[in-house]
């Protein structure tokens, strides 16, 4: 046996073993065999579509829950590459994407949107579905490939001309793996809207063909990104300011981009939502810490300059500025660091420093340009304090 054949045989064994392990231990790759894990399949496939769209500078991604229990995800991006590289065969890129974990053909770093917790890639849907069909429209040709439980039934085949570009992946989750194959329209709609809010200008839609009373559909596109997010969170509350404060900046020290939006309400509780590369960080992290420190510093410095605080009195610490605060803190990093395997908390000192300085500068500038509104915010924060502290 030649060395090449030996390497090919070893690769095939690894692929088969990986597929069998994913089917035998699905919770290791998508979290559970319940509806949570089912939704992870949708997120893994949708992530690839969104990242191709964002890399191409716009477009839309459509998610459809079909009448026969399938999920179809279509985009109008450039299409998964089919071109041969070196001695690779036509179709290798598609097959690699659909059969091997963590081999997504997408831009890396700060341009990557992460929908799911696990980051396995579309291969999770290939392996954990009874069948999957991939259609790619690229270079004027439409090609199709079908899979059954992770195994390709045939190589990608030309299926006629294509007048547009894009990729459509349809899959039917395997009932032998999942306790249920019924996706929740409400849960998916919430996550689809969240991703649209965090990526301004991106159009995402969700359609449900299953209801007996007729199809239901929602579509999301938000031109103001995080600013729209805060406005939505505060839609039914009384606000201190007539508008949302929002800004975005790039910081090479943290190797990424930060987007922040904030406002204050008459209510007392704090509502801060944070994200890293579009994935929620429910446990917070250094970006949240930097945000709070930056807000406190900007407000304290402005209040002292305007005589709204006594020089020898207490400053507006993070514990005080959070009262009634609604905010969205979103960072897009080349190399995000996380504390813990669930990626629920962002780590890294550079993220904290970058967000703190950026918020301090941008919010400070906004306060200086709007002194009356700044006074209203500071008054809101200090109104329950002892008069001698003001």
Language-model regions: role of each:
Residues 1-43, 106, 381:
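Bergerat-fold GHKL ATPase/HATPase_c domain
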Residues 2-11, 60, 67-93, 97, ...:
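GHKL-type ATPase core
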Residues 15-23, 160-168, 262-278:
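Flexible hinge/switch segments at interdomain interfaces of large molecular machines
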Residues 35-61, 121-128:
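Conserved ATP-binding N-box helix of the HATPase_c
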Residues 76, 336-355:
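Short, low-complexity, polybasic intrinsically disordered segments
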Residues 185, 193-196, 204, 292, ...:
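Duplex nucleic acid-engaging cores and interfaces of nucleic-acid transaction enzymes
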Residues 186, 194, 201, 205-342, ...:
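GHKL/Histidine-kinase-like ATPase module
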Residues 349-389:
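Flexible helix-coil linker/hinge segments at domain or subdomain boundaries
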């Amino acid at each position: 046996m030649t060395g090449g054949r030996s390497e090919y045989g070893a690769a095939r064994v690894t692929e088969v073993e990986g597929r069998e392990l994913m089917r035998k231990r699905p919770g290791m790759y998508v979290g559970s065999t319940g509806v949570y894990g089912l939704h992870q399949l949708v997120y893994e496939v949708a992530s690839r579509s969104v990242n191709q769209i964002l890399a191409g500078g716009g477009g839309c991604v459509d998610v459809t829950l079909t009448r026969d229990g399938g999920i179809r995800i279509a985009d109008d991006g450039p299409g998964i590459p089919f071109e041969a590289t070196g001695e690779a065969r036509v179709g290798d890129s598609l097959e690699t994407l659909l059969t091997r974990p963590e081999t997504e053909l997408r831009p890396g770093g700060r341009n990557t949107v992460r929908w799911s917790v696990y980051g396995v890639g579309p291969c999770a849907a290939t392996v954990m579905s009874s069948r999957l069909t991939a259609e790619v429209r690229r270079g004027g040709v439409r090609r199709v490939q079908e899979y059954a439980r992770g195994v390709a039934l045939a190589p990608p085949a030309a299926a006629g001309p294509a007048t547009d570009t894009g990729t459509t992946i349809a899959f039917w989750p395997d009932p032998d793996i999942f306790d249920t194959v019924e996706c929740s329209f409400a849960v998916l709609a919430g996550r689809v809207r969240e991703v649209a809010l965090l990526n301004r200008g991106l159009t995402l839609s969700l359609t449900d063909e299953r209801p007996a009373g007729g199809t239901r559909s929602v579509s999301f596109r938000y031109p103001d990104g995080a600013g729209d997010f805060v406005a939505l969170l505060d839609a039914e509350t009384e606000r201190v300011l007539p508008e949302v404060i929002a800004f975005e900046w790039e910081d090479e020290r943290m190797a990424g981009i930060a987007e922040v939006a904030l406002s204050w309400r008459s209510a007392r509780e704090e509502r801060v939502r944070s994200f890293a590369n579009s994935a929620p960080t429910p446990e917070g992290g250094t970006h949240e810490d930097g945000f709070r420190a930056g807000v406190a510093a900007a407000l304290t410095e402005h209040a002292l300059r305007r005589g709204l605080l006594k020089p020898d009195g207490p400053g507006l610490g993070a514990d005080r500025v959070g009262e009634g605060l609604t905010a969205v803190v979103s960072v897009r990093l080349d190399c995000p660091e996380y504390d813990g395997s669930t990626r629920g908390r962002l780590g890294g000192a550079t993220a904290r420093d970058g967000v703190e300085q950026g918020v301090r500068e941008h919010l400070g500038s906004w306060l200086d340009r709007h002194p009356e509104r700044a006074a209203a915010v500071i008054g809101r924060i200090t109104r329950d304090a002892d008069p001698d502290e003001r």
